[in-house]
């Protein structure tokens, strides 16, 4: 599922010129910033490596950026890979044996590591040792390699898929939350200065409130609105051109697009608002379950249009009102579902 409001990173997201390099430049996630600052300063004062860190939460909120910031703050090299890219134990061994003291190893989608890889990772994280088997059959022997003190930073959008043994080895687990409108305005204002865009306060607010609480989406929309302004002969991005461009992009007043409407209307039209199972929804919409759970559902839940229950997905009265559809008579049972299972 790829669209203008997808929180997943795309090849067209040019983030390097505007990506913050240090904690003081990073906007939002205030508690995480403050805690990281303490942990980093404490580790440096003791001349120790920073504890292994796990960032989790919806995509597009800054997990990769924070990992790079940590690398800059502690003065180590930044090495990046992803769970799906590490196919064999040898792949992981090659990465680990090339690390230096205080390096940061960032593993995106860490929940997708297979069990064999995880088992090699455990002693590397705990004891900074790598146990590998050299040779085959009767000639095989175990070799222990000492690794430098490094910091592993994992990132995941699916914390529940991370195995307990791996999760427990992260000394600093941190959840990233959706941004509010004011925080997104700060992100947009900072980016507009770096990109030399004349962005008014009203234009910034219009883009921010339709960005699904996600900086990556806000920055993507800013670039597209800049295009509309340029073609329309406008020198600045104000509320008028922002509203025009966002409507052309089919982004509504609260940040929903056609995919969200398809999702909500399917449940409303076919199941009177639910409950309905996620597999049924995925099959009907011809979408992958993971795409729905990672791209569409988190924001709908965040703004109160969708609820997950033990019996399936249920859209709320607020969702019917936003769709301008009559609320079914039995809608009151949507909330009884929760009361019965609390």
From Swiss-Prot:
E.C. no: 3.6.4.-
Entry keyword set: ATP-binding, Cytoplasm, DNA damage, DNA recombination, DNA repair, DNA-binding, Hydrolase, Nucleotide-binding
Protein name according to UniProt: Holliday junction branch migration complex subunit RuvB
Catalytic activity: ATP + H2O = ADP + phosphate + H(+)
Notes concerning its domains: Has 3 domains, the large (RuvB-L) and small ATPase (RuvB-S) domains and the C-terminal head (RuvB-H) domain. The head domain binds DNA, while the ATPase domains jointly bind ATP, ADP or are empty depending on the state of the subunit in the translocation cycle. During a single DNA translocation step the structure of each domain remains the same, but their relative positions change.
Lineage of the organism: Bacteria, Pseudomonadati, Pseudomonadota, Alphaproteobacteria, Rickettsiales
PANTHER family, sorted: HOLLIDAY JUNCTION BRANCH MIGRATION COMPLEX SUBUNIT RUVB, PTHR42848
Region entry Large ATPase domain (RuvB-L), spans: 1-179
Residues engaged in binding ATP: 18-19, 60, 63-65, 126-128, 169, 179, 216
Region (Head domain (RuvB-H)): 253-342
Gene encoding the protein: ruvB
One function term, GO molecular function aspect: four-way junction helicase activity
InterPro entries: AAA+_ATPase, AAA_lid_4, DNA_helicase_Holl-junc_RuvB, P-loop_NTPase, RuvB-like_N, RuvB_C, WH-like_DNA-bd_sf, WH_DNA-bd_sf
Chain sites annotated for binding DNA: 289, 308, 313
Subunit structure of this chain's protein: Homohexamer. Forms an RuvA(8)-RuvB(12)-Holliday junction (HJ) complex. HJ DNA is sandwiched between 2 RuvA tetramers; dsDNA enters through RuvA and exits via RuvB. An RuvB hexamer assembles on each DNA strand where it exits the tetramer. Each RuvB hexamer is contacted by two RuvA subunits (via domain III) on 2 adjacent RuvB subunits; this complex drives branch migration. In the full resolvosome a probable DNA-RuvA(4)-RuvB(12)-RuvC(2) complex forms which resolves the HJ.
Biological role: The RuvA-RuvB-RuvC complex processes Holliday junction (HJ) DNA during genetic recombination and DNA repair, while the RuvA-RuvB complex plays an important role in the rescue of blocked DNA replication forks via replication fork reversal (RFR). RuvA specifically binds to HJ cruciform DNA, conferring on it an open structure. The RuvB hexamer acts as an ATP-dependent pump, pulling dsDNA into and through the RuvAB complex. RuvB forms 2 homohexamers on either side of HJ DNA bound by 1 or 2 RuvA tetramers; 4 subunits per hexamer contact DNA at a time.
Keyword presence, Nucleotidyltransferase: no
């Amino acid at each position: 599922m790829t669209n203008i409001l997808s929180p997943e990173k795309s090849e067209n997201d040019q983030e390097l010129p505007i990506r913050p390099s240090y904690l003081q430049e990073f906007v939002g996630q205030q508690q995480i910033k403050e805690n990281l600052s303490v942990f980093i300063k404490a580790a440096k004062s003791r001349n120790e490596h920073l504890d292994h860190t796990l960032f989790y939460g919806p995509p597009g909120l800054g997990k990769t950026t924070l990992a790079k910031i940590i690398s800059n703050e502690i003065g180590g090299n930044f090495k990046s890979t992803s769970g799906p890219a590490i196919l064999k134990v040898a792949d992981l061994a090659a990465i680990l044996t090339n690390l230096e003291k205080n390096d940061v190893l960032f593993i995106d989608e860490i929940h997708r590591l297979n069990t064999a890889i995880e088992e090699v990772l455990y002693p590397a994280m705990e004891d900074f040792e790598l146990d590998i088997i050299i040779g085959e059959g009767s000639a095989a022997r175990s070799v222990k390699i000492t690794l430098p003190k490094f910091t592993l930073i994992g990132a995941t959008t699916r914390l529940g898929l991370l195995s307990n043994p791996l999760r427990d080895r992260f000394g600093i687990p941190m959840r990233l939350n959706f941004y509010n409108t004011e925080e997104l305005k700060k992100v947009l204002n900072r980016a507009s200065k770096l990109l030399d865009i004349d962005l008014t306060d009203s234009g910034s607010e219009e883009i921010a409130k339709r960005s699904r609480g996600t900086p990556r989406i806000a920055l993507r929309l800013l670039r597209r609105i800049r295009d509309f302004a340029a073609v329309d002969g406008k020198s600045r991005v104000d509320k008028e051109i922002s509203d025009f461009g966002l409507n052309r992009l089919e982004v509504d007043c609260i940040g929903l697009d056609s995919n969200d409407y398809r999702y909500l209307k399917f449940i409303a039209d076919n199941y009177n608002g639910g409950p309905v199972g996620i597999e049924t929804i995925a099959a009907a919409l011809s979408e992958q379950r993971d795409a729905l759970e990672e791209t569409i559902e988190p924001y709908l839940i965040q703004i109160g249009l969708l609820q997950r229950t033990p019996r399936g997905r249920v859209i709320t009265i607020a969702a019917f009102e936003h769709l301008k559809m009559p609320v079914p008579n039995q809608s009151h049972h949507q909330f009884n579902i929760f009361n019965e299972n609390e």
